[in-house]
Every structure is written in structure tokens, then in C-alpha cells.
UniProtKB/Swiss-Prot annotation:
PROSITE patterns: MAP_2. Residues 57-71 have a biased composition (Basic residues). A divalent metal cation 1 binds at D215, D226, E426. This is Methionine aminopeptidase 2.
Length: 445
């Protein structure tokens, strides 16, 4: 969902409850041990029976075992263990810490303390919680996604894992506003760069020769972590992916307090367009998609709201500066096509407009649907599958009416020319007073 338009497994079963444990995470006790302890199977106080109690001891069939000390809870495959049980003290891993370059390295002591006091409480804990959920879900997904799966299976598997790890299933009123999915899972194939998720009945299947951008978000109390990666099975696309990953990392390196957006865009474009990719004997320069941008992230507002800023991925233009305390999605898109996207295909993504006008609605279906959207999503983006999941039906007329009245925005898929291939990588960064934190960084990208 993160893309902002410039103005102008075999069989994957991510829903399966089976699977071996994947990732050891420091915590106290294992899930199995805790369950046994609660049933009384383990008892440290039990020793050898006294002489007068030998009969009672013989009758006791449960085998006495010592508690295992130091064992760690683990995440399952697919991910289903709520993250708070793996980190009982709410001490979630920090992201990659990067010092500011040159003149941005020095911040006055009092200013730093004031801001750190504000950031080192719920703000950072909630962001790091969301980021760790994103890492665990995507790292499993990158291993599990295979050709032959439907896009619906892939998207819903990721979403089910996010709901499980955050502990917010999203079926009760207001549940999704407390935490969970921040926007619909984008599974964008080939020339489609962004904003595509399957609607109900979609039968599209992932093929070996496809290039798929997977873009999903996690939030805790409106603190949104927005990160994306690209999957390609055919090594012919390796240079395309390398170009975009390099460009995103270049943007992250350049970003910082008082840095101009135009300078970041120029560095991103230079990095990306130094690559080319050969497909079926033809060489294609990798072009930065000039009308897609990174962006600020606000609380419950993926594009930062009315005061949001854009981070270009080409040179020229905006002289606006980044500021301390801001949160950014640094994302880049590369293409073998024209390097320009347009609206295409069936719309699936929608979002209620912050401070939308108070328009009298004549259609009762529109009124009812607006109430559902407000109570379940607020200003977080949603898709038609999410409305289906809440039991809504025959809502398209009302939804289109909300769009027509300027209350809800529609976000159609954004595509380059057919036959081209696009790639995306994205991270969320926090501009802390003395360092920037790449909150979504992982071992994978």
C-alpha cells in the first residue's frame, strides 16, 4: 500500500496450523512446557516418597520430571504464536541504528533529551513490536511462497499470520484499530507495481517466470511499519532486484534531519539506473519509476495525512527538508518499461479520507457502510476482502457512492506498460534526534 503517486507452498498453506518451529527467540519457558506445568505434570517439589507413603507413591502414574531451565519459546511455521508471549517484558529488538552523516551528527543535549524522553516509551515499543511481527511473517513467507499458489492464498496467509502475532483477529468492532494489519497485502505481478490485492473470486496463480512485489504493513496502536520486498524465481531478474535494493539502501543512507528531498531522489536514481537487466537476449536499462514516491507515515495515516511529505526517487523538484521525529517509508521502484505508472485493472484498495467533508448521504447502504469503515478501519486502508470478512455484502453501490462524495479514496493498481517487469524494496525509518533507526531492517533485506 505504501506507494504514493507523485502529483501532476508446491502448495503453500500459510493458514495451516501445523509446522515445525522456525526461529528461537529469547524468552522464558517453551509453549509445551508451560502447558504441561499448568496441568501439574512437572513438580519441582516432588522427591522420593516417605516410607509410610509407598503405596500412594506407586499409585501415582505421572512421571516426575525436572523443569527444563533456560529453554526458549519459539515461533511456529507458519507463524501463529502471539509475539508478546515471546517477549514478555515488551523489550522488542531495535532496528538498524545509523549515525547521521557530517553536519547532522550533532544535536544539542537538551533537545536530544527532550525528544528521547518522548520516543523511548510507548512510541518505540509499539514500532518495534510491529517491526518484529513484520520480520517474522515475511521471513517465513519468503521461504514458503512458491509458483502454483494463488495470489489469494498468499495474501490471506500473510494476513492471518499478522493477526495471530499481534493478537488482533480484526473481527470485533474496533479490534483492527488497536493493532494488526495496517493496509491490504499487495501482491503485485510483473508490470503492476503497487496497490494490487485480489478481490473475492480471484483465481490468479503465481508462475515461475513472474516477478512479485509483496507489500504489507503492521501496526500497533496506529504506529505503522511499512515494508516491502520482491520475489523472483528465475535468476534472469536478479539484476532488477539488485538495482532496486541498492536504490532503497542508498535512499536510507542519504535520509536524515535537514536533508532535502531532491538530494535523496537524485542519489536513488543514480544508484538504480546504473544497472541493466538482460531478458531473453535483450538488455533493458533499469529505470526509476518517476511518479512513485516514498512518504511520511502518520499515526493511522499511511501517507502522513494532509501535512505528509513525499520522498522522490528521481532527481529534481522538491526542496523540502526532512525533520527530526518524522517517520518515513523509504521505498523505490524500478522498471524495465517506461518508468511511469498509470491506473489499471480492478480497484481493491480504499481508505477513508482524514477530515473528510460532512456530506449528507442519500443512500442508506452508503451510510451503513461508512459506519462499518469508521469503526473497523478508521483512516487505515482496507480492501474488499476485508469487508467480505466482516460479513458485509452487496456493498459496492454504497462504496462507490462514498468515493463519489469524496469521503473514501479509491486506490487502483498502478502499472507500467504490459510486458515490462517492476521491482520494489521498502523500509520504515525513524528520524531520532541523534540517530536514524531502520525499524524494519532484518537479516533478509
Amino acid at each position: 500500500m505504501a506507494a504514493q503517486v507523485a502529483s501532476g507452498v508446491g502448495n503453500l498453506n500459510l493458514n495451516s496450523e501445523d509446522g515445525a518451529a522456525a526461529k528461537n527467540i529469547s524468552a522464558q519457558g517453551s509453549p509445551e512446557n508451560e502447558a504441561r506445568e499448568s496441568d501439574g505434570e512437572y513438580d519441582d517439589d516432588q522427591g522420593a516418597p516417605e516410607l509410610g507413603n509407598t503405596t500412594a507413591a506407586k499409585k501415582k502414574k505421572k512421571k516426575t520430571k525436572k523443569k527444563k531451565k533456560g529453554t526458549s519459546k519459539v515461533q511456529t511455521e507458519p507463524p501463529r504464536v502471539i509475539l508478546s508471549s515471546l517477549f514478555p517484558n515488551n523489550q522488542y529488538p531495535e532496528g538498524e541504528i545509523i549515525e547521521y552523516q557530517n553536519e547532522n551528527a550533532y544535536r544539542t543535549t537538551n533537545e536530544e533529551k527532550r525528544h528521547l524522553d518522548r520516543m523511548n516509551n510507548d512510541f518505540l515499543a509499539e514500532y518495534r513490536y510491529a517491526a518484529e511481527v513484520h520480520r517474522q511473517v515475511r521471513q517465513y513467507s519468503q521461504k514458503a511462497i512458491k509458483p502454483g499458489q494463488t495470489l489469494t492464498e498468499i495474501a490471506e496467509g500473510i494476513e492471518e499470520s499478522v493477526r495471530a502475532l499481534t493478537g488482533y483477529p480484526g473481527l470485533e468492532e474496533g479490534d483492527n484499530l488497536r493493532g494488526g494489519i495496517a493496509f491490504p497485502t499487495g501482491v503485485n505481478l510483473n508490470h503492476c507495481a503497487a496497490h494490487y490485492t485480489p478481490n473475492a473470486g480471484n483465481k490468479m496463480v503465481l508462475q515461475y517466470e513472474d516477478v512479485m512485489k509483496v507489500d504489507f504493513g503492521v501496526h500497533i496502536n496506529g504506529r505503522i511499519v511499512d515494508s516491502a520486498f520482491t520475489i523472483a524465481f528465475d535468476p534472469v531478474y536478479d539484476n532488477l532486484l539488485a538495482a532496486v535494493k541498492d536504490a532503497t539502501n542508498t535512499g536510507i543512507k542519504q535520509a536524515g534531519i535537514d536533508v532535502r528531498m531532491s538530494d535523496i531522489g537524485a542519489a536513488i536514481q543514480e544508484a538504480m539506473e546504473s544497472y541493466e537487466v538482460e531478458i531473453k537476449g535483450t538488455s533493458y536499462p533499469v529505470k526509476a519509476i518517476r511518479n512513485l514516491n516514498g512518504h511520511t507515515i502518520g499515526r493511522y495515516e499511511i501517507h502522513g495525512g494532509k501535512n505528509g511529505k513525499s520522498v522522490p526517487i528521481v532527481k529534481g523538484g522538491d526542496q523540502t527538508k526532512m525533520e527530526e521525529g518524522e517517520v518515513y517509508a523509504i521505498e523505490t521502484f524500478g522498471s524495465t518499461g517506461r518508468g511511469y505508472v498509470r491506473d489499471d485493472m480492478e480497484t481493491s484498495h480504499y481508505a477513508k479520507i482524514p477530515d473528510a467533508p460532512n456530506v449528507p448521504l442519500r443512500l442508506s447502504s452508503a451510510k451503513n457502510l461508512l459506519n462499518v469503515i469508521t469503526k473497523n478501519f478508521g483512516t487505515l486502508p482496507f480492501c474488499r476482502r476485508y469487508l467480505d470478512r466482516l460479513g458485509q455484502d452487496k456493498y459496492l453501490l454504497g462504496l462507490n457512492n462514498l468515493v463519489a462524495n469524496g469521503i473514501v479514496d479509491a486506490y487502483p493498481p498502478l502499472c507500467d506498460v504490459k510486458g515490462s517487469y517492476t521491482a520494489q524494496f521498502e523500509h520504515t525509518i525513524l528520524l531520532r534526534p541523534n540517530v536514524k533507526e531502520v525499524i524494519s531492517r532484518g537479516d533478509d533485506y
